[in-house]
Design a protein with these regions (language model features):
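Sec-dependent N-terminal signal peptides of Gram-negative exported proteins
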Residues: 1-20
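Poly-acidic low-complexity segments
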Residues: 3, 66, 144-145
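Acidic, serine/threonine-rich low-complexity disordered tracts
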Residues: 20-113, 157-274
Length: 274
């Protein structure tokens, strides 16, 4: 049985390349997101993704503050690696660390053959006896939040293909084990910006949050997220790929409406790996 600490955080390019001289090449994507709680800006997140053949490496750096850090200042780093296959992502590692307000922590996970094989959380915390335990069987086929966000949605149709919303994603973030059941909601046109390489249309998916284990039944966020029908993710195509990645996320929480919106996306062409 795997015990965890519910750290919260809350891209699928399959065509790697080989240069003519057989040197492996790499594609790099940089996506920036603005994070808000209701109408208040909390900070930003930057995800840098490197892809070579079927391998991926992702690093996310976040900075969140209130009043320029006078009341609150938090920095987070998350990372993931693995492979993208025709059946979906196969993560090998995932990590999340944070530091702020005199507090810090780190979570690390390893995967093998489609299941979690190791979990480390520092500092360790005493498990609440009310917590629903995570079983090893529940971890088979589960993926980490990075793989879930960037490597599950794929389509050759770049114009807001609503078929990318027809899926259920099994997620384990080191604390909670849950399913995200996506379903088509609508297609919307986006305003084109010079700073973004996203396509013109977004597929808007309704998301049903289905908690399975690793949580306390009276957790207020669990209650809000599992009973709302307002969770949305807007998925957009990255030109030149079959990737659909998040452009906009809406997540009701016990503290208010949390949202993340992409402000820019940069795609850099193939280049030799360092």
């Amino acid at each position: 049985m795997v015990q965890g600490n519910p750290y919260r955080e809350s891209p699928c390019l399959l065509c790697g390349a080989l240069a003519e001289d057989s040197i492996a090449t790499e594609t790099r994507l940089v996506a920036n997101y603005r994070v808000d709680l209701d109408n208040f800006n909390l900070g930003s997140f930057r995800f840098t993704t490197r892809l070579s053949a079927s391998d991926y490496r992702v690093r996310g750096d976040g900075h969140f503050s209130i009043l320029g850090g006078l009341l609150y200042d938090l920095r987070t780093t998350t990372a993931g690696s693995g492979k993208v296959t025709s059946a979906g992502p196969e993560p090998t590692t995932y990590s999340l660390s944070y530091a702020g307000g005199g507090d810090s922590g780190q979570l690390r996970m390893s995967f093998d053959a489609g299941t979690v094989t190791a979990l480390s959380i520092v500092p360790q915390q005493t498990r609440d006896p009310r917590e629903i335990p995570v079983t090893q069987a529940q971890l088979v086929g589960a993926i980490d939040p990075i793989a879930a966000a960037f490597f599950r949605a794929r389509s050759d149709d770049p114009n807001g293909d609503l078929k990318v919303c027809d899926q259920t994603v099994p997620v384990f973030d080191g604390g909670w084990r849950y399913d995200l059941a996506l379903s088509p909601k609508r297609k919307v046109a986006l305003q084109r910006k010079a700073s973004t390489a996203y396509s013109r249309y977004a597929a808007v998916c309704r998301v049903e949050f289905k908690p399975i284990s690793g949580y306390e039944p009276d957790d207020p966020n669990i209650k809000v997220m599992s009973h709302t029908d307002a969770i949305e993710v807007w998925l957009v195509s990255v030109p030149g790929t079959d990737m659909y990645v998040p452009y906009h996320i809406l997540l009701p929480t016990d503290s208010g409406l949390l949202s993340a919106t992409s402000t820019s996306l940069r795609v850099e062409g193939n280049r030799p790996q360092p």
